[in-house]
Regions:
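Conserved sequence signature across two-component system core domains
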Residues: 7-8, 34, 52
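N-terminal amphipathic alpha-helix initiation
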Residues: 6-9, 13, 127
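Extreme N-terminal starter segment of soluble prokaryotic enzymes
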Residues: 1-4
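C-terminal output/effector regions of signal-responsive regulators
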Residues: 133-138
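CheY-like receiver
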Residues: 23, 37-43, 49-132
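Two-component/phosphorelay signaling modules centered on CheY-like receiver
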Residues: 10-32
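A generic secondary-structure micro-motif detector
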Residues: 7, 30, 76-77
Length: 138
């Protein structure tokens, strides 16, 4: 199960992303949705999750400022924005992906599948069984 947090200052953006995530054939749990970066920051510091879907342009604190304020980042970031001029800066902040709004469902699926592949420790078919058998024989 992929555990995600959604942060966008526009309520309709967090709600629509939440709806899209629930309709996918991928096991995703939305742990929290925020429209206020300061409230989100408190949650982020106190909870563990896999991916933060983070808007860049927000009042009071933009997405880059939010990440800069964290001592450590133990989750992956997917930036969401209507402005493609931030793409290079997003990857400098170690984003795993960058999705333009409105978010395309196929791009979102590709993003989540790529994350699963990156974090998966699965071995090719047969290799795991071989290793288990070798361990049992010793």
């Amino acid at each position: 199960m992929i555990k995600v947090v959604l942060l966008d200052d526009e309520v309709h953006c967090t709600e629509s992303l939440d709806i899209i995530l629930k309709t996918l054939n991928i096991e995703v749990e939305v742990l929290a949705k925020f429209n206020d970066p300061e409230l989100a920051l408190k949650f982020i510091k106190q909870n563990q999750f896999d991916i933060l879907f983070l808007d860049i342009e927000m009042p009071r604190m933009n997405g880059f400022e939010l990440l800069s304020s964290l001592n450590q980042i133990n989750f992956d970031v997917v930036f969401t924005t209507a402005y493609n001029q931030y793409a290079i800066k997003a990857f400098k902040f170690s984003a795993i992906n960058y999705l333009l709004k409105p978010i395309d469902e196929i791009e979102l699926i590709d993003c989540l599948e790529a994350w699963k592949a990156k974090t998966s420790k699965q071995m090719p078919n047969g290799q795991l069984e071989f290793l288990l058998q070798a361990i049992q024989n010793n």
